[in-house]
């Protein structure tokens, strides 16, 4: 999903650049100004959607680790760790420690869910429980914890689906507006006329290729000069 959103974001930015280029020559065009505003809004929406998921877990991890004292952990230790699905702290057991990367593989007690988390995010069980009690959170039963996690995941999924729906609607609206803008620009060209290059081949055998002067100083088209007398054959000995 992130890859698709990144592609859409690049597409929106490219469209915005084209609209801004068009506005440089027609800055009062209301349609272009509205299109620019809409594109800016959908770009911000896409950026927000891309950054929402990782920021939630990161914020929870940072706040949890900020009060984390140093502790020497070993395999088999009980600890309090953050579950990435809801950002809440639960009791877990250390299964493996990676000293090089500063991480630990843990399993949440009573659930069996395994995760790899930074060692700095772990707390001794008693300290973790006390921190939760001090914050006004009473220990919950296993059934209550499962119900809370399920409800959180459900709300998060609904919110995510709604944001995706809004983004898709914005994308469709922009597609229609962009097509209308292109059609209007195309229709302004006179029908039946084809722009020709000043260097295009003449349509008749008597036509000549020249460089137009655009009417400057009433000068005519530059005329073809016969340069045959300068042919190298005239310089060869007879």
From Swiss-Prot:
It is found in: Nucleus speckle; Nucleus, Cajal body. Residues 72-132 form the Tudor domain. GO terms for cellular component: Cajal body; cytoplasm; nuclear speck; precatalytic spliceosome. A motif (Nuclear localization signal) lies at residues 142-160. It comes from Pongo abelii (Sumatran orangutan). The Tudor domain mediates association with dimethylarginines, which are common in snRNP proteins. Involved in spliceosome assembly. GO terms for biological process: apoptotic process; mRNA processing; regulation of alternative mRNA splicing, via spliceosome; RNA splicing. This is Survival of motor neuron-related-splicing factor 30. Associates with spliceosomes. Associates with U4/U5/U6 tri-snRNP and with U2 snRNP. Its main location: nucleus. It comes from the Eukaryota. Keywords: Acetylation, Apoptosis, mRNA processing, mRNA splicing, Nucleus, Phosphoprotein, Spliceosome. Gene3D superfamilies: 2.30.30.140. The modification N6-acetyllysine is found at residue 219. GO terms for molecular function: RNA binding.
């Amino acid at each position: 999903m992130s890859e698709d959103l990144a592609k859409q974001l690049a597409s929106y930015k490219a469209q915005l650049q084209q609209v801004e280029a068009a506005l440089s020559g027609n800055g009062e065009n209301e349609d272009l100004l509205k299109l620019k505003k809409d594109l800016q809004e959908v770009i911000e929406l896409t950026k927000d959607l891309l950054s929402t998921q990782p920021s939630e877990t990161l914020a929870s991890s940072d706040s949890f680790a900020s009060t984390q004292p140093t502790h020497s952990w070993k395999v088999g230790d009980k600890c309090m760790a953050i579950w990435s699905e809801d950002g809440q702290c639960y009791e877990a057991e250390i299964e493996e420690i990676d000293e090089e990367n500063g991480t630990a593989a843990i399993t949440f007690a009573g659930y069996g869910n395994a995760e790899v988390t930074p060692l700095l995010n772990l707390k001794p069980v008693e300290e973790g429980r006390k921190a939760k009690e001090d914050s006004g959170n009473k220990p919950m039963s296993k059934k209550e914890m499962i119900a809370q996690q399920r409800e959180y995941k459900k709300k998060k999924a609904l919110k995510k689906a709604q944001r995706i729906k809004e983004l898709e609607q914005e994308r469709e609206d922009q597609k229609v507006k962009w097509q209308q803008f292109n059609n209007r620009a195309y229709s302004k060209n006179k029908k039946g006329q084809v722009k020709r290059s000043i260097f295009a081949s003449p349509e008749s055998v008597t036509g000549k290729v020249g460089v137009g002067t655009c009417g400057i100083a009433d000068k005519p088209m530059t005329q073809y000069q016969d340069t045959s007398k300068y042919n190298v054959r005239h310089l060869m000995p007879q």
